[in-house]
Amino acid sequence: MKHLKNLILVVATAIILILITATIVESSKGTAFVRQHIYTSAWFVVLWAALAVAAAVYIVLRKNKSNVSTSVLLVHASFLVILLGAFTSWTMAESGTIHLRQNETTSTMKDEEGKTKELGFEVSLKNFNVVNYPGTDAPMDYVTTLTANTQEIKVSMNNIGSFNGYRFIQSGYDSDMQGTTLGVYHDPWGIGITYTGYALLFISLITTMVSKKTRMRHLYRKALSLQGAKAWAVTALLAVSSFATSANAQEMVKIDGDIADDFGKICVLYNSRITPINTVATSFVTKLCGKPTWDGLSSNQVFAGWIFDVPYWETVKMIEIKEKKAQELLGINGKWASFDDFWDSYNNYKLDAPLKKAYKDGDTKLQKQLRDADEKFNIIRMLYGGEMLKMFPYAGKQGHMQWFAPGQPLGNLKLDEKELVFIKKSMDYLAESIITGDKARAEEIAKKIYSYQHVRGKAVVPTKFRIYTETFYNKTNAQRLPVMLYLTLSLVLAIVSTLSLNNGKQKKTRLVSSVLTWVMLIHTTLLLALRWYVSGHLPMSNGYETMQFMAWATLVATLVMQKRFLPVKQFGPLLSSFALLVAMITDGNPQITQLMPVLQSPLLSVHVMVIMFSYALFGLTALIGLQGLIAHHRKQEEKEQQLAALSQFLLYPAVALIAIGIFIGAIWANVSWGRYWSWDSKETWALITMLIYSAPLHADIKWLRKAQHMHIYMLLAFLSVLMTYFGVNYFLSGMHSYA
């Protein structure tokens, strides 16, 4: 038994290390290389088989010697079934691609090695269409209609077509819309076996957590002894400073706030969405100076200024330049530049030559140093070019909606004279009213533009309530002040709870902590709900949104467990605050965009939600581990043991959630990509994380029985979560780059 257990540990550790190495090698050698030499190689399959056989034998022997619950046996059995399904797919599945032009017929496909294989039937392309979001040019879906023998088959994103056991997945299309590329997969047995394993895993995990015979119950009772006891916290020093400088070179036109707000309600096509100008203004101003306001002026006022009072605003030093090299090339002192600072005395763009040289020489360091400044310069140029002011809709042939900016050539549009004059002159009239401060006239013109939009684009222009909601969201979404406030308060509460020696102060601290948790939860829920309503989809499509959801999930978990587990109550707001801080830092002004077609699946939303809940629990175990090490340092042995039990208890739902989340993601991938597992870097690291966190759940690992070792392990294990969420996005490659 002992030798068999050691063999399992060695093989499992080897697999984890190989997976880590493979993801690193992939970033330099490419996906095809690691797929051929590692993931699909015979020796790697043998390694997994050895782990499966050894684990199966060990479970049988262990069952005969000790009272192992049926639910725990089923968990392990489900993984064996999943591995059997994967082995079946590896040995029996076929895959390839076909490319068809309209009305073209084929009976073959090309496999990954470029070899031709017979399908056993003929398939032809009837037509291919790109379906856009209403009123925009953003693709909502790609739809291919095939004919296999005499049967018509529809293939689109998240909708696989099938015939005779072959599955067709939308993979690409020709630029002239007359051709399509489809992935073809034939896996008659592997998918069914694997899905059986998924179902068995889900049932067994739920049974394990509710069963009274599992180790989880013992850990629950042991962790409960923490209730009412003083918990230890780690103190940290937080220093927050801000500085803003505004240099006025000439008298500006003061734009009335109400007039600017009316202007902000006009809709434009921006970032493939129909959105109020207020959203564009918020994005524009935040991008330039790092915050949605400037010198006491709202984003609407500043944006209107850049449109209607150009000479003044080009002299305002409101463009934040962080890189020293960019500051040096622009000839500015400090980090604030004006648009005029980007031009030399000959009206040449100062960064043009250095950037061209950097790209020519492959100087990535200089490219990185100048990229942010160049992007801000070009955002202003985009505004001047009308890219942010496409406000006049026109429904062309087949209902395709075009949007035009003021002054943009209208081509051969069939418009009467009055309408043409309105399109060409309305912005001039609005500019005159804004500059002269004629509030009534400006409001009237803004309403006329909005009314025109509803006449010409009534099917796609947002309602007044949706516009109000989006502008309200833009105002309430400012992150810096609330995040810093939450972070400061949660740190102070952690410190106070450590220093409070009498129960009276402890009770006050707990009360304040509960109030803070509820305030943060209500605030985060409001932001997520507003973003959901405005975007039209669950806000979990990018890093900013998923970090916000992780903060929300942490707060929910805190409120659920705070009455029984004091450390969770103390650390929940702190972990949530850090999640919000990361969201703020990584994307200070996240844009709301239309979803990529492949992301329009309820399965994906559930996958992300479940995974983020598991990350929240893993984060709590890391903080509890830190607290446990402090207890060890202070020779609080009983407290140290209790905290270790709490970490292990939280691992049960955390590991269950990440396992369920991974396999829901696999089902989504199977529906969207045709494969339930493709060894993408993100899914590989999620598997690594699950394997790492599964180890402490096995009582047979003696090293982890010691509380100190358990706490160290929990801290180090969280590095895998950080790598899965951040490292893969920034350092590795894969299909999850949009996450």
Predicted regions mapped to residue ranges:
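Solvent-exposed, non-transmembrane regions of integral membrane proteins
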Residues: 1-739
